[in-house]
């Protein structure tokens, strides 16, 4: 019954206005009130501040600052094997597996295809036919930074406007095509394992999506598709972020983007170049740095 009510509210509530107002509230410098809200949030969700670069809550002037708190990557064991790809975010695996031509997965009566998820961009769709994928739901209490599974050079960036339904697994199960219908940021990387898409999916109450190379992508929400192209790298020894010839290069385990509230990250991998870790299963709780897959170097 509760699940049905949650689904109905997704249609009835003015989600965009709620998201806008939540963004304003989270940016408010409320002094002791803000600190109290942050402390309450920490206690409710049992957040481990020792994983943060700055564990002192007095240094966070807004709730957004706390939400975007920098995660200390050194608190995690990163799989440094050059032939492995790592989990890009703290969260829960909501789906994982192989792509059958362009069919990604089915849940209840809803089928997800590359065509819908990638907004009909055939040049990108073709990279991932018969490839593999993983979808990680990031709960509100988790670190909201998304990291690189492997070193990659950014080639294309697409902002696709859309709905702002919740991406909680219960909602995805009951509302058709949420991940395709919601706004999203599609980042296409060229890697040593072939092309990889890292997709940041917007959601209810997500006030902003940002990347490390161009800052805030949304808001404002203009309803327009935006498409950026980036040059190839000319550096044969890519290990760090670089602006060589304007190329955007991010190393494995580097920060890539951030949500200003919990949401979902989707990774797509090219056919026959990436073998997913067989130990990973649906609903597994995963941490940044764990082994996601093994890759074949092109």
From Swiss-Prot:
It is an enzyme of class 4 (lyase). Coiled coil: none annotated. It is found in: Cell membrane. Its cofactor is pyruvate. One of its GO terms (molecular function) is phosphatidylserine decarboxylase activity. The modification Pyruvic acid (Ser) is found at residue 263. Is synthesized initially as an inactive proenzyme. Formation of the active enzyme involves a self-maturation process in which the active site pyruvoyl group is generated from an internal serine residue via an autocatalytic post-translational modification. Two non-identical subunits are generated from the proenzyme in this reaction, and the pyruvate is formed at the N-terminus of the alpha chain, which is derived from the carboxyl end of the proenzyme. Its main location: membrane. It catalyses: a 1,2-diacyl-sn-glycero-3-phospho-L-serine + H(+) = a 1,2-diacyl-sn-glycero-3-phosphoethanolamine + CO2. Pathway: Phospholipid metabolism; phosphatidylethanolamine biosynthesis; phosphatidylethanolamine from CDP-diacylglycerol: step 2/2. InterPro entries: PS_Dcarbxylase, PSD-B, PSD_type1_pro. Keywords: Cell membrane, Decarboxylase, Lipid biosynthesis, Lipid metabolism, Lyase, Membrane, Phospholipid biosynthesis, Phospholipid metabolism, Pyruvate, Zymogen. Its EC number is 4.1.1.65. One of its GO terms (cellular component) is plasma membrane. The active site is at 90 (charge relay system), 263 (charge relay system), 263 (schiff-base intermediate with substrate). The keyword Cell membrane applies. Binds 1 pyruvoyl group covalently per subunit. The record marks 262-263 as: Cleavage (non-hydrolytic). It is a peripheral membrane protein. Pfam families: PS_Dcarbxylase. GO terms for biological process: phosphatidylethanolamine biosynthetic process. Heterodimer of a large membrane-associated beta subunit and a small pyruvoyl-containing alpha subunit. Catalyzes the formation of phosphatidylethanolamine (PtdEtn) from phosphatidylserine (PtdSer). Belongs to the phosphatidylserine decarboxylase family. PSD-B subfamily. Prokaryotic type I sub-subfamily. This is Phosphatidylserine decarboxylase proenzyme. The lineage of its organism: Bacteria, Pseudomonadati, Pseudomonadota, Gammaproteobacteria, Enterobacterales. The gene is psd.
